Curated annotation (Swiss-Prot):
InterPro entries: CRIB_dom (IPR000095), CRIB_dom_sf (IPR036936), Kinase-like_dom_sf (IPR011009), PAK3-like (IPR051931), PAK_BD (IPR033923), Prot_kinase_dom (IPR000719), Protein_kinase_ATP_BS (IPR017441), STKc_PAK6 (IPR035066). GO terms for cellular component: cytoplasm; fibrillar center; nucleoplasm; postsynaptic density. One of its GO terms (biological process) is learning. Residues 201-212, 268-278 have a biased composition (Low complexity). The active site is at D526. The lineage of its organism: Eukaryota, Metazoa, Chordata, Craniata, Vertebrata. This is Serine/threonine-protein kinase PAK 6. The gene is PAK6. SUPFAM superfamilies: Protein kinase-like (PK-like).
């Protein structure tokens, strides 16, 4: 009577109006699934492709720019801080946009970044895999060093003394330094004589030591222009390998001048008004339309002379403030060993350019007592741009608003090295757009996110993917681009073979885009079939600008290890100075990809392939007997080891092979064939 009544089971009806639209099966011959939904198929395809790499330990350094002083800290409020930092951000170029990191990352962060490179081999020093007898180079002291940082040839291995940790100048000194001319320096020299004790004191904002960092010790021992300093270690004069004798009177005089100049920095910072730390607008660099700037000798400057001085810091060996991916004329010791100026550009002694070069290369780090430095270990990242500061800088570049209010029907269609790509629909127009979503916290180098916005916004071309808008959504950067339904060229070359008319059509479109970008001083640095997208009517467009760089007359070369291993040019792998010629080499590898179905050495590991590309003769076609002599000549003009002998994009547009170029419609059958092969069974 009092028993609990059982609940009546709900009745669940069968599916209504059910339609079997997707049928997935496994093809044992091909060893893959067929009939997968498009978003699943795209994810599987992209996971199999090699990812681009950025070696954080090999980042090109640049000279000091005014805005970087503010990045290292300011006494102004946050709003004024960001406004002063980016008052001219709308005209920001990639040269300056890549410089928002305050200083070199710590060893822990470098190790984490290396673990993100997409291959287990990159967890260790890449140099140990790329060592070869030809890879020896000299340090500023004339010692030959191998790529893996071994013992200098011709010298006994000597114990490396405990290095002294650096300290960073107070805020506003760089801006103050730029306003100082030769006359002011001479007038302040007497005042600086009374401040010698400042060289031994430690300011509150001391930079953290990394004396226990083995990788940092290795970088300090290297002294190579290609390697970004692994730490900010500064050794004493007696700690250099080779044990030089006592300095000459002229050397001591130059060293004293440099120390007096540093002392003046400390004294002027204590009395400088707050307004002196606010930088002016960042210098605007005009794009460089010349591929190879002329080289000529210049009279040696003070910076070049300082290379051989036994001072407390080897000038030009360490980057004072930035880890940006731009090359500095002061670091180009091979092309201009006796000058501290840009090759082919002379500046009179004492000119603002010369003084700026001296300041940026030698006068920003001071030695510090190791016992004091150990106490600053807790505040290790005080000089690094915070996440909120970086977001504020990025917010000044992107469009305002929330794209989630404008878009709907998100479908993930791909995944890359920097983020995911979704297909979405605009609510007001119904147009389909591709949305690239990149998490700011998961980037190998977050500064490169500016490239996604700045390059595609400023350089529009018929053969370049159009960017509609960019937004900052929470912790992600969203870039809205046109959606090309034909897919990537990779999908086609991996399934079918292209005839020479189709190869010429693709090459002509890519060369048109590269000729335009190179004339503007833009290096793509990741040319491959994955970066070439197609429309349904056969038009070819270049995409993926996340790893590009910009050169100019002031920054004519780059030297960072950036790109996808199998498509990298030899000069990129060997960390030599390079310019737009690296894109031509990568295009040549892509031509091999269109003929053979895959790039050379694709069965090797990425590191092994890079070693072969660096040390071996240019790769050849597997099916060279199937191509015409004019195509072979076209390919040989691109795959030349010497960048100076390699053809430019404009020269290749005049090559006879491109006379076979057809209309975009000639690529439509390839797109349709691929879509048919991947359609539902």
């Amino acid at each position: 009577m009092f028993r609990k009544k059982k609940k009546k089971r709900p009745e669940i009806s069968a599916p209504q109006n059910f339609q079997h639209r997707v049928h997935t099966s496994f093809d044992p011959k091909e060893g893959k699934f067929v009939g997968l939904p498009p978003q699943w198929q795209n994810i599987l395809d992209t996971l199999r492709r090699p990812k681009p790499v950025v070696d954080p330990s090999r980042i090109t350094r640049v000279q000091l720019q005014p805005m970087k002083t503010v990045v290292r800290g300011s006494t102004m409020p946050m709003d004024g801080y960001i406004s002063g930092l980016l008052n001219d951000i709308q005209k920001l170029s990639v040269i300056s946009s890549n410089t928002l990191r305050g200083r070199s990352p710590t060893s822990r962060r470098r190790a984490q970044s290396l673990g993100l490179l997409g291959d287990e081999h990159w967890a260790t020093d890449p140099d140990m895999y790329l060592q070869s007898p030809q890879s020896e180079r000299t340090d500023p002291h004339g010692l030959y060093l191998s790529c893996n940082g071994g013992t200098p040839a011709g010298h006994k291995q000597m114990p490396w003394p405990e290095p002294q940790s650096p300290r960073v100048l107070p805020n506003g000194l760089a801006a103050k330094a730029q306003s100082l001319g030769p006359a002011e320096f001479q007038g302040a020299s007497q005042r600086c004589l009374q401040l010698g004790a400042c060289l031994q004191s430690s300011p509150p904002g001391a930079s953290p030591p990394t004396g226990t960092n083995r990788r940092g010790m290795k970088a300090a021992k290297h002294g190579s222009e290609e390697a970004r300093p692994q730490s900010c270690l500064v050794g004493s004069a007696t700690g250099r390998p080779g044990g030089e004798g006592s300095p000459s009177p002229k050397t001591r005089e130059s060293s004293l001048k440099r120390r007096l100049f540093r002392s003046m920095f400390l004294s002027t910072a204590a009395t400088a008004p707050p307004s002196s730390s606010k930088p002016g607008p960042p210098p605007q660099s005009k794009p460089n339309s010349s591929f190879r700037p002329p080289q000529k000798d210049n009279p040696p400057s003070l910076v070049a002379k300082a290379q051989s001085l036994p001072s407390d810091q080897p000038v030009g060996t360490f980057s004072p403030l930035t880890t940006s991916d731009t090359s500095s004329p002061q670091k180009s010791l091979r092309t201009a060993p006796a000058t501290g100026q840009l090759p082919g550009r002379s500046s009179p002694a004492g000119s603002p350019r010369t003084w700026h070069a001296q300041i940026s290369t030698s006068n920003l780090y001071l030695p510090q007592d190791p016992t004091v430095a150990k106490g600053a270990l807790a505040g290790e990242d005080t000089g690094v741009v915070t996440h909120e500061q970086f977001k504020a800088a990025l917010r000044m570049v992107v469009d305002q608003g929330d794209p989630r209010l404008l878009l709907d029907s998100y479908v993930k269609i791909g995944e890359g090295s920097t983020g995911i790509v979704c297909l979405a629909r605009e609510k007001h127009s119904g147009r389909q757009v591709a949305v690239k979503m990149m998490d700011l916290r998961k980037q190998q180098r977050r500064e490169l996110l500016f490239n996604e916005v700045v390059i595609m916004r400023d350089y529009q071309h018929f053969n370049v993917v159009e960017m509609y808008k960019s937004y900052l959504v929470g912790e992600e950067l969203w870039v809205l681009m046109e959606f090309l339904q034909g897919g990537a060229l990779t999908d086609i070359v991996s399934q079918v073979r292209l005839n020479e008319e189709q190869i010429a059509t693709v090459c002509e479109a890519v060369l048109q885009a590269l000729a335009y970008l190179h004339a503007q001083g833009v290096i793509h640095r990741d040319i491959k079939s994955d970066s070439i997208l197609l429309t349904l009517d056969g038009r070819v467009k270049l995409s993926d600008f996340g790893f590009c760089a910009q050169i100019s007359k002031d920054v004519p070369k780059r030297k960072s290890l950036v790109g996808t291993p199998y498509w990298m040019a030899p000069e990129v792998i060997s960390r030599s100075l390079y310019a737009t010629e690296v894109d031509i080499w990568s295009l040549g590898i892509m031509v091999i990809e269109m003929v053979d179905g895959e790039p050379p050495y694709f069965s090797d590991s990425p590191v092994q392939a890079m070693k072969r590309l660096r040390d071996s003769p240019p790769p050849k076609l597997k099916n060279s007997h199937k191509v015409s002599p004019v195509l072979r000549d076209f390919l040989e003009r691109m795959l030349v080891r010497d960048p100076q002998e390699r053809a430019t994009a404009q020269e290749l547009l005049d090559h006879p092979f491109l006379l076979q170029t057809g209309l975009p419609e000639c690529l439509v059958p390839l797109i349709q064939l691929y879509r048919k092969q991947t359609s539902t069974c």
